[in-house]
Amino acid sequence: MRSLWLLVFSFSVLTGTNMAFPMILSERPEVTGSFKVKDTSLTHLTVHRKTGEVFVGAINRVYKLSANLTETRSHQTGPVEDNAKCYPPPSVRACTQKLESTDNVNKLLLVDYAGNRLVACGSIWQGVCQFLRLEDLFKLGEPHHRKEHYLSGAKESDGMAGVVVGDDDGDLKKKKKGGSRLFIGAAIDGKSEYFPTLSSRKLVADEESVNMFSLVYQDEFVSSQIKIPSDTLSQYPAFDIYYVYGFSSRTYIYFLTLQLDTQLTQVDVTGEKFFTSKIVRMCSNDTEFYSYVEFPLGCTKDGVEYRLVQAAYKHRPGKILAQALGLSEDEDVLFVIFSQGQKNRANPPRETVLCLFTLHQINLAMRERIKSCYRGEGKLSLPWLLNKELPCINTPKQIGDDFCGLVLNQPLGGLMVIEGIPLFDDRTDGMASVAAYTYGDHSVVFVGTRSGHLKKIRVNGVPPPSENALLYETVTVVEGSPILRDMVFSPDYQYIYLLSDKQVSRLPVESCSQYSSCKTCLGSGDPHCGWCVLHNKCSRKEACEKWAEPLHFSTELKQCVDITVTPDNMSVTSVSTQLSVKVANVPNLSAGVTCVFEELTESPGEVLAEGQILCMSPSLRDVPSVTQGYGDKRVVKLSLKSKETGLKFITTDFVFYNCSVLQSCSSCVSSPFPCNWCKYRHICTNNVAECSFQEGRVSSAEGCPQILPSSDILVPAGIVRPITLRARNLPQPQSGQKNYECVFNIQGKVQRIPAVRFNSSCIQCQNTSYWYEGNEMGDLPVDFSIVWDGDFPIDKPSSMRALLYKCEAQRDSCGLCLKADSTFECGWCLADKKCLLKQHCPSAEHNWMHQGRRNIRCSHPRITKIRPLTGPKEGGTRVTIEGENLGLQVREITHVRVAGVRCNPAAAEYISAERIVCDMEESLMSSPPGGPVELCIGDCSAEYRTQSTQTYSFVMPSFSRVRPEKGPVSGGTRLTISGRHLDAGSAVTVFLAQEECLFVRRTVREIVCVTPPSASGSGPSSVKLFIDKAEITSDTRYIYTEDPNISTIEPNWSIINGSTSLTVTGTNLLTIQEPKVRAKYGGVETTNICSLVNDSVMTCLAPGIIYTKREAPESGVHPDEFGFILDHVSALLILNGTPFTYYPNPTFEPLGNAGILEVKPGSPIILKGKNLIPPAPGNIRLNYSVTIGETPCLLTVSESQLLCDSPDLTGEQRVMILVGGLEYSPGMLHIYSDSTLTLPAIIGIGAGGGVLLIAIIAVLIAYKRKTRDADRTLKRLQLQMDNLESRVALECKEAFAELQTDIQELTNDMDGVKIPFLEYRTYTMRVMFPGIEEHPVLKELDSPANVEKALRLFSQLLHNKMFLLTFIHTLEAQRSFSMRDRGNVASLLMAALQGRMEYATVVLKQLLADLIEKNLENRNHPKLLLRRTESVAEKMLTNWFTFLLHRFLKECAGEPLFMLYCAIKQQMEKGPIDAITGEARYSLSEDKLIRQQIDYKQLTLMCIPPEGEAGTEIPVKVLNCDTITQVKDKLLDAVYKGIPYSQRPQADDMDLEWRQGRLTRIILQDEDVTTKIESDWKRLNTLAHYQVTDGSLVALVQKQVSAYNIANSFTFTRSLSRYESLLRTSSSPDSLRSRAPMITPDQETGTKLWHLVKNHEHADQREGDRGSKMVSEIYLTRLLATKGTLQKFVDDLFETVFSTAHRGSALPLAIKYMFDFLDEQADKRQITDPDVRHTWKSNCLPLRFWVNVIKNPQFVFDIHKNSITDACLSVVAQTFMDSCSTSEHRLGKDSPSNKLLYAKDIPNYKSWVERYYRDISKMPSISDQDMDAYLVEQSRLHGNEFNTLSALSELYFYINKYKEEILTALDRDGYCRKHKLRHKLEQAINLMSGSS
């Protein structure tokens, strides 16, 4: 079998996860590069295996990125006009379905290395593919005209996979002929008649070849494809096969698929759907698909089945894994990720598992299945194929590994699931993508998750060994954003590229540098990482110097350097000591080491044998302060530094200790360091010389002086008594030392009492009494200590305390006194009726009761409180009785009766002396009376009997109403039950049917409880109460209703802080009492409130989330859970089907410097910030509120700033911004007025003015009348000036705001507009013969035979170069041969020679050479060459470029030109346009700018299109100042968007109806009987004139010719037609101002028409009007705003024209060829001035061709160009010309505005032009042969566009006119005489004249 090279590209990348080691969660920023998008979604990723360049597929885009993810190219693939029901697509055949702007979803992206191109397959036009050049993404082709070109129109981006197979056998001819093959599997979305599910296609070299994507083999019976039978789809409409991953291995092609399990899924469409995973295999050289085998695939872990394949990756195992599997290292394994179960393909469970399959295992299962089938066993068993029930046919056949099937027993399915080996499972993150590679002997698997993380897993074995898969690191890539399937390594395997919805990320495959120690490095489990010993770093071995030398690079934990120091501690008082350092596992240290004690000292180490090093500890002067502030010790790092590397390579702890810090004997002697306690000096020291035995040295805890533990020391307050304590080792005070003292701290007061030491083991505080203030506490814990010699404390147990107590405090009754702790020795003194010590009670023997006495009872019990006070007569009420002296034991309580009814005491609830709890028995009376509580203690004698003052009553509770009356089945409703006596009794239980309602609270009139879930579903339930033993019922019912449901949340996003408004729609919402919305993120739940609007709508404030990382990603984060708390409706707690996104909170920059900004009143304020408009879909935006001081301001919001009008305030005002519950204050505004006069100055001026005024008054009396008039004029002027100033400010501010907001809107409006290119013939005719629609060259020549013969003879002459040159030169020599004639002859010649372009080019070059020669001979400036059309050659050159640049216009330059035209048109129409003068609010031309303030308002009309029905209305934006014709034009533009102008109705053919109900229809016209006439001015009707309102319904209907219409429109049609002819001309004017139509009186009525502005030059313009006019130049700011809005489109056009790359298109050959010709001519004539060459090229191409096209886009597109668009295009064209000029532009304030407008841009454009010319000159020259071949091809394509005979007939006119001159010229030329050209011409003339 011939060798094959197999290139595999899969668009499914896998994911895995496992737990096993000390896993690292990497928080540091791992992503080393990223590429982000906002306006699209990314779908696929591939990396060039040689260059490392990254290619990314997206919706409507393909990007090319550098290896570090910098964008280098992008290619637009959509949107396009399409409809999924159009087959073939509308690009091939007109479709009856409505076309809509459709996104192109990239579904397949792979590199065809053999063809050196990128294959990008999308979803539009039934799934066509584009071939893009790898270098620049230039579109090489997009085959879309055959059925084989349509792969699948399904929209899902992850249902397609492909494998490329290419020939590599060295047979170049065969290779060129055959090319590569593409095996492609695709989900077909139910369209099996259109698309195969799996096929093998040809990839031929020519992208436009008819064979591209054709099936590798096809005859009438068999082909290289498999289709899903239509019967399968009719039975299971949801059936499809989704291709997850494709790859090749040896001679086979494999696909992993996910498909509907037809055996588990019910036929019923609404039933639950089950899916199964399968692996498909075919031979790579099988053209008939006989080898197709399909087997189920799955994995089981811990008894749980995983059947939903998510991603996969083929890999050759590392040595360790291969050995564990028993494989050789060149055999392939497959890592596969599955989700749990078989449901939810679109949103699979997060419980996932990473499994391993060997291809040996898979192939073995398939081979055995094939063998059994060929033995005739079983059936074909492919569930989704019609022949699944066909039996296998017994066919003797040797089945080996290379068997590729026969015509029978195929396609074949397996029934047994091939089970994978589970390696790692994950139950939270949800694994979604996987990739693997081998590093050293290890297999490393990288897994992307749905939570945006990357898991790194080392796979070295399989079960049963425990270390089968080790998760050693998790890296955050894009938090909350799922990692998509495509994960690809860089060619050198240093990086891995990951893809999410909005970002491509590049991460290093390892991050060894994050580990700072050998143990964490080698313990991480990362196989890339080892410890570089002398460099003290974790790295790959390649990054470690001398890694191959012994012990330089460690890879195992046991190889980590070990260090021990002897001794390992020293006192801060010790002198410098030699330390012995022992190190193990170190390389040769012969270069030397130094010993470093942190920042203290560094000294050389002496290296001895066997890893021993001697170091010196720091000297005494370096150490004293080392432990200061560190307590009794400080640990410092002792490090060894290698002199070889200059780095510390091992560090250990060394301790400096300080005994003197320890203040007690026990802490001193228990120290781990050699500290001794000197008890007579009361110090701790390590120096034994400082403390001899005579000084009481103690070295063990047993020898410490200490008080021994005992129980609490009880001290009765006020009683004088000694306190004796047991002790040990109490020292005898020496001479000069003070004796012992007891120190008590009572309520902050210190009490010192002398103590007596009896011996070393006993001490006594002498007789004294102790007291504490107040009786609030019965006992008070007191701090105490024993000290000697002043302040030397004796150690005592920390828990030991003294307790000071008073018997009478808080014990004011006999019962409470006798309850006291018996150790207090308190008793009740009957005489004093107090709780006292025995010695304080007189006649204690008789009067003092205490616990020691038997059978004591307290007399005179008293009841203070009973509860409850009411209860049912049925009993069961638990009554609580509180009081004093209520017995000491429960057995003393007898005879308890409540209102005469027995009540049984509950022993467990009894509190001695204070409380009795008893249970009521039933009253046997029908209406028992109430009464007090009675009880006895012991017996019922008078002194032991009591009765309560409160009375207990029997009541009959009842209820009559519940509210609310209904609630959800799941319960949770707070139910209020209303009635009487509902607070009776001690316990209440509420039942709804048989379920208990959870009690909340109750009062006398109501009970509140929370409803339980209904056990019987919806419907009414009975309500029943149990109060103690009483059962209460009623007829009242509570109704359970269906649980509420949530259908939509708008918007489905908020900001991190939440509190933005959400509108929630659903059902049954009114049954919920307190709805809340909830979110859970990072384990923290947050909620916010909702308000019910009606049963189907509620509004909520979004809950915020706690986001702890620095900043949320721009793409947003998704909460772990999002849902609603609707009572107990648990189904809505988590809404997994509603993805909710949290975007970063907006932030704002401080105002000005230090948060203060100075502004004038009314000035716009810019508040800059970030994240102001979240990148969420839809039109909902954040609601901002800005206040300045207390005053709100009007806002304009953009992505990075708020534009705010400051209010009319002055002084310091704080700015506050409110959004989503957040408040920001970016600072203070200092608003200052223009007044600069101080108060004294004003007073001074006022006083001086007063004196002056008195003098002036006397003078003015004489001139009273004149003064009054002057004063009135002055006031009027002042008023006008104020008015003018405010309007100027308003105008500037409007222009500024427009500039900020228009650009984005305009760009959005441009998206998806289809370009209406003219066909080739119309395009060339408009350039060659502008303004002539029906030219003779387009028609057949109807002429006699002799004329045709004469013209053919004339044609032969024209094809003689010398004749043609003589003919042209002779014509040009004639005075009467006008400029128009020259252009006409040039165009006729090009039309006649269209079929011989190579000959026309030769003639053109000669004519240009002659023109250059003539130019130089006449001593004209060389720069004037080709400047004007003064010769036939110049117009021929224009036509030549017109012919040859047509394809370039269509493929490249046409788009930015059309976008510029559309942008201008739309921007102009956003503001008022004067229908008469053509002037507009938005303009680039000063001459076409409305220089007045026009008040207008935007309206949205709902338009019913012609032949449209109700309900098909289209919203269209118009202005209320638009004339009716202007409105009709805008409506037609909207209705016929994307339709060429010539194919749609015109405004004049339509009437505009305003519909105000069913019957009222008003026809609106520019002029009718309602038209306003003032003086002799008549104003055109506008929408405002008719008072049309926003949202009005209008219709476009065919114009009806009626008497009404004639009467009302005759005058207007006649008077306006002359302006229409001027405004709608297709040619560009020489002078824009001269084009404006003059307003002349109507011939019949004498009135003049106007629309927005009256002509200022007209004689009757009243002078009084000037008062209301603004200085017109102020409106020039609008030019700048318009220019800014259109800048992007102008730049795009210029960049396309002046770029050799042309966004992917090659430079047209014609440009390079002609530029080289001009350079040759300059060289030939020794012209070295570069400016001359530059000018020739500029005059040749930009001036002759591009300027013409820019000014007249209607030459290229089927569009209408109005006068304002024409004026703007002329400004752009002039800028284009200026950019090509070499002369300097000197500009001043008097320069034309269009020159000033682009003054800053022109130098940049000039540099583009210079670079363009320079790049072209550097390109390799085009040979004449190559150019001729290209020209011949052009002639073949377009040779029949014009009628040659008709063109010749038109040219003959000039032969006839200048016959004598031409014949004479032929006579004079030697060549012409020799070849008798005169004779031949005369023959033609005679034949022609014969016809006449």
Curated annotation (Swiss-Prot):
Entries under InterPro entries matching the protein: Ig-like_fold, Ig_E-set, IPT_dom, Plexin, Plexin_cytoplasmic_RasGAP_dom, Plexin_RBD, Plexin_repeat, PSI
Entry keyword Electron transport: no
Gene3D superfamilies cross-referenced by the UniProt entry: GTPase Activation - p120gap, domain 1, Immunoglobulins, Phosphatidylinositol 3-kinase Catalytic Subunit, Chain A, domain 1, YVTN repeat-like/Quinoprotein amine dehydrogenase
Tissue expression pattern: Detected in primary motor neurons in the embryonic nervous system.
Domain Sema, chain residue ranges per copy: 21-509
Coiled coil: 1262-1315
Cytoplasmic domain ranges by topology: 1262-1892
Family: Belongs to the plexin family.
Name the UniProt record assigns to this protein: Plexin A3
